Amino acid sequence: MLSAALLLPAPAKAVSADHAYVLDGVTGRVLFEKNAGERGLIASTTKIMTALVVCEQCNVLDRMRIPGEAVGIEGSSMYLKEGEVLTLQELLYGLMLSSGNDAAVALAIYCGGTVEGFAELMNDKARNLGLADTHFENPNGLDSPGHYSTARDLAKLAAYAMENPIFRKTVSTRSVTVGQRHLTNHNKLLWRLEGADGVKTGFTKAAGRILVSSASRMGRRVICVTMNDPDDWNDHCALLNRSFSDYQICPVVVKGQCVGTLEVLGGENSRVEVLAAEDFSYALTPEETVRIALPGPGFVYAPAVEGAEAGFAYALISGKAVGKIPIVFGETVEQKPEEEKSFWQKWLSGKNKET
């Protein structure tokens, strides 16, 4: 497992998007970025957070009666009718497949009491996930000056959300029937790209085309985000395919592997082995190698106890830290007992005290 944010994004290549970000979902390595930290409108990709909050805080088997406030909402819709009864899961399908703004309002009222109350839940979750450049004012993504995110934050949000099995099942569904409605997922990548399994489209005139996608191949997931991208389908296919072909997940160290030695000051032995406390893998190109380095000053004071925490080792590529691995002592090194003083050492010590 990776225990630190990973660096070294690939240089920006030609994409039509104003903002883009590609994230390896296993190791957290940034595979590509372009203006990824600039805030912008995010349209219906907002609904990733809406769905996540519902999945985490509500029982999706609950049934709700649709209130009048959730009917006739502007923009994309699943065409809810006042008084009809649907499960939250059915509303999630309407939210994430049909991009229903009405479904977003219905879910917000059920889970948050009010739209405003639900927006606070969304912002609480954003803070919890460390999405410092994200703020929500509504559950559907209708344009608002205080409603924004970045390509980087959207990728982090999507990577987290795809770990939730209910969310993952919902966004990977191509089509479903809800009552008399046949809902088809707006995400064309589910049909066009090998391994595509989510997550959300978005569009307003002010925001342009926004797309957050996920693809999984051989147990590895990659998240891709573009903002204001007129050629998003082709860009995502190219970025995701390139990510899978150019990078492979490579084991760097395994738990229990010796990663070096430290000097032991005042110990019965002069050095002690340190072991990786967990596995560490990283997304690498064929040309890259990872070097493991121990932090300075390179020594510890005795005693060193087998299995006790010894700090961290750092994984480096071309001298740059890309992650850190917790390490433990591989053996016990006791403190060296104080040597018995000779007669003359004791005599000299006594004379020094007298003076």
Per-region residue spans from a language model:
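Bacterial N-terminal signal peptides
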Residues: 1-5
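Active-site-adjacent loops and short helices of periplasmic peptidoglycan-processing enzymes
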Residues: 6-152, 156-165
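Domain-terminus/edge residues, biased toward the C-terminal soluble/receptor-binding domains
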Residues: 131-132, 143-355
